[in-house]
Amino acid sequence: MSKEIAKKRIEELRDLLNTFNYQYHVLDNPSVSDAEYDRNMQELIKLEAENPEFMSEDSPSVRVGGTVLDIFEKVTHKSPMLSLGNAFNEGDLRDFDRRVRQGIDGANVRYICELKIDGLAVSLHYEKGRFIQGATRGDGVTGEDITQNLKTIKAIPLRLNEEVTLEARGEAYMPKRSFVKLNEEKEQNGEDVFANPRNAAAGSIRQLDPKIAAKRNLSMFVYGLANVEEKTIPSHSESLDFLGELGFKTNPNRRTCETIEEVIAYVEEWQEKRPHLDYEIDGIVIKVDDVALQESLGTTAKSPRWAIAYKFPAEEVVTRLTGIELSVGRTGVVTPTAELEPVRVAGTIVRRASLHNEDLIREKDIRIGDYVVVKKAGDIIPEVVNVIFDKRTGEEEEYRMPTHCPACESELVRLEEEVALRCINPTCPAQIREGLIHFVSRNAMNIDGLGERVITQLFDADYIRTFADLYALTKEQLLQLERFGEKSATNLIQAIENSKENSLERLLFGLGIRHVGAKAARTFAEHFETMDELVKATEEELKAINEIGEKMAQSVVTYFDNEDVLELLQQFKEYGVNMTYKGIKIADLQNVESYFAGKTVVLTGKLEVMGRSEAKKKIEALGGKVTGSVSKSTDLVVAGEAAGSKLAQAEKHNVEVWNEERFLQELNK
């Protein structure tokens, strides 16, 4: 390559990488995969090494991060939040080990390996044990003050167990299950979805309204101690132990290694285990454990010499998009789905991938017949990353979203501030079917044996069109359906009959009122106690309830201001469906004989129907004690969604574990 061509390519790569950095670090909206970014960066580093006369102090290869938006107050870090150098294979790790050993002149070295959490790096400042400020990494020198949003993350202690002044650093992230649920809600509401949990975490933390961040179920692992007053800690592993003792959440999967072979074994182990975690990791961080050796090795302008990040190979594959199918959800949102030639991604065969909405198809210029890059967002949901334009033949077909609903042929609309097309026909069969599936689901009426397949059979046979129709079903009708015998038909009729006794909150959630989730349904049920009282409530009365906002209050009032809905409630009454709250109020729990009396309970994960704070109050009102960690003295662990390391601790100490459903059964006895 001539010098002229090399110079031109270096300039192209710098412009490209600066754009990628801006999109990733400033806008929190990356346009390329990590694998593509890394390929461009490695090419730039190689060209600059071969052509040192073209080296520049502002090249992306030596610069840390990007600029800061003026939305939040700026914060200057007391010590720079440096990025880490990258390793992509075993050879890179051995080169790192060789450089470290040369730099410490024969001293013994021990490494500490940690999972590289794929989230948003933040710093936390404490004065005399109190959390006073939190900031994003920003460009490594200057970040943004996001204190109020970080206070909504329960994994971040507002007061430490000691009155110590320090700065801790960590990674805020969104659990995979929370990511899936958030995107499902955004799709139902016709909003843009997040591409992956990292974007979801970053987008949530950088919201100007802390209430939005509070609803996003974020968490955080602290991975380092930047400084601490009046205390010297000789090793990184001991600093993590100290942070854990102070009340921080540290990742339990770290390991100290005496040799580079042990480091490589750890990397290989977690490359296999990675899909089983409930949070995203994109590699392994390897650090020299001894702090004195770290100081001896020092740093470059961009990264410390005593640490490196091993990047896992990108879980991306190429396949052909053969078609686009449309589905209509229970709220009327029309979602396009890519049909793919079967391909293995992250251990499973993928045949379909979400395209989310029409805007995404246009932005990525996706056409039927294209070869596309596919990955699993959050290692869970298959998504189309981009089109391989070089493989186009000219025979690909442009796709246009229909103007009418594929299920009922009603005209589709795009509501104000929504990106999704929506069918607003209340009699749309697809919406009715999806609504029925939701009505019988686990957190709603929980009718055993009545899943999507059976609902579809009943719907296609014209046996059900409304929720109330379920309670008019007969055994004779069920026996007309495929796979139903005398016993299965009898069991299902009994399960439907049993569901009539459910408490009000299950019925409310099952109705599918827009913006009302399981937790809000329970709040309404406990507050009003009967359906009749809730139906009469005004918007002002609803907004006066803690955690109920204007949008939800309006939605509830609008829902019940409908003659068809009132007719449905009357039918429920005639069929004997309970419409009163059967749960126990905190005020009624005093002096009640309870399983929880005298027991120590740990709550972990997200409780769908009842928030953890409410669950804690009720357990304590029943004479129990709620603690934050599992030990030999723990009697019970209640595990909700995205339960983490406390489950492993429960198994280690042989502690009984309940899911939320079992917990609610005991609570409501």
Swiss-Prot record:
Instruction: Spell out the GO cellular component terms annotated for this protein, sorted alphabetically and separated by semicolons.
Output: cytosol
What is the name of the protein in this document? DNA ligase
**Which GO molecular function annotations are given, in alphabetical order?**
DNA binding; DNA ligase (NAD+) activity; metal ion binding
The species this protein belongs to is Bacillus cereus (strain ATCC 14579 / DSM 31 / CCUG 7414 / JCM 2152 / NBRC 15305 / NCIMB 9373 / NCTC 2599 / NRRL B-3711)
In terms of HAMAP family, this protein maps to: DNA_ligase_A
Please name the InterPro entries in this protein's record: BRCT_dom (IPR001357), BRCT_dom_sf (IPR036420), DisA/LigA_HHH (IPR041663), DNA_ligase (IPR001679), DNA_ligase_AS (IPR018239), DNA_ligase_CS (IPR033136), DNAligase_adenylation (IPR013839), DNAligase_N (IPR013840)
The UniProt record lists the keyword Magnesium: yes
What NCBIfam families has UniProt attached to this entry? dnlj, PRK07956.1
Task: Give me the reactions it catalyses.
Answer: NAD(+) + (deoxyribonucleotide)n-3'-hydroxyl + 5'-phospho-(deoxyribonucleotide)m = (deoxyribonucleotide)n+m + AMP + beta-nicotinamide D-nucleotide
Under which main EC class is this enzyme filed? Answer: ligase
CDD domains xref list: BRCT_DNA_ligase_like, LIGANc
Sorted keywords for this record are: DNA damage, DNA repair, DNA replication, Ligase, Magnesium, Manganese, Metal-binding, NAD, Zinc
- Gene3D superfamilies linked: 5' to 3' exonuclease, C-terminal subdomain (1.10.150.20), 6.20.10.30, BRCT domain (3.40.50.10190), DNA ligase/mRNA capping enzyme (3.30.470.30), Helix hairpin bin (1.10.287.610), Nucleic acid-binding proteins (2.40.50.140)
| Record-listed E.C. numbers | 6.5.1.2
BRCT domain location is 591-669
Q: Where is the signal peptide?
A: none
List of residues binding Zn(2+): 405, 408, 423, 428
General function of this protein: DNA ligase that catalyzes the formation of phosphodiester linkages between 5'-phosphoryl and 3'-hydroxyl groups in double-stranded DNA using NAD as a coenzyme and as the energy source for the reaction. It is essential for DNA replication and repair of damaged DNA.
